[in-house]
Amino acid sequence: MNKYESVVIVNPNLEEESIKNLVKKFSDLINTDGKVTSVEEMGKRKLAYEIKKLKEGFYIVIKFEAKPELIAELERNYRITDEVMKFMVVKEEE
């Protein structure tokens, strides 16, 4: 299994409970075929440019181990989740 890091920017207007539910949803998806090693909620940050007419975003960093096939499914879930504004998944160097 490879090590990955995923940065997800979600709508900053969400309630804390909604953000926790999103983190749980993505963590559960990763844990089906991999293992989450850490989740860090970095909080609201100013964006470099407006996304969906918003100047701030709530940043979440998820580090995990998974098979490469899981990444496509994870990215598909990010795309169809309305609350997700931007995301990025990168493979960590060994």
Pin down the residues of each PLM region.
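Structured, basic alpha/beta domains of bacterial-type, RNA-associated proteins
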Residues: 2-94
